[in-house]
Amino acid sequence: MADQTLSFPPSEAGKLGPYLTPTRAHRAPALPFVTLTFATSLDSALSLAPGTRTALSGPQSKAMTHYLRSRHDAICVGVGTAIADDPGLNCRLQGVDTAQQPRPIVVDPRLRWEFTRESKVLQLVRAGRGLAPFIITADRTPPSSQRALLEEHGGKYVFLAHDSLTKQRFKWDNMLRAIAAEGLQSIMIEGGGDIINSLLEPESCHLIDSVILTIAPTWLGQGGVVVSPPRRLGSLGEPIPAARLTDTTWIPLGEDVVLCGRLASQT
């Protein structure tokens, strides 16, 4: 648990500033500001295989991720990431105290995440270096021991109805409204693949305010977890691109490149 404190140069932080403020005057106050951010390989992969933790970010882009966490009220991952990575879901940026830590959000429709007192996120709470997670689930009967452990650390379950009984998923606008109702006005969506791809689907991608991607100079090869949302169809039923970024900025960070942008309007 001796995680190194990180620093991020103000000169680089300034380049990210335009993508960290609200950009749409018609944004409903019931929805938080949403930043989609993740690290990807040159072949759009997040990891070598499902359930396999894969480090992609170099030291400078890793520090950038923690700077971004310091600028958001919450960070969101799916249950697969929580199980595979045992993530800390905190901000290690120098000078960030407990009150400035982002709230972890774990999307776990069927309560698959069997966290324990030794889970890293809860260890960090006890060390005063992070906050306990809010777990979004459709299962209204969590084990009493899990619930007690979570609430002991300051976390809780947030209950939400499924979008579909077959997909076992939530509608993104419902999730974001539930998050905003907890007083969280901005959120980073960090992964994993199912979470990212579902957010980029046509019915939900309009909810994204900014996109900040780290591109690592490596190919992971076939069989990895990839970011590849469904294609859209044009007026004649022809396939058209799923989404495109506009207002882009490219920022070299060590051997990585960071791409910032906003989703172009879909017509």
Regions found by a protein language model. Name each.
Residues 1-267:
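Enzymes that bind and transform nitrogen-containing heteroaromatic metabolites
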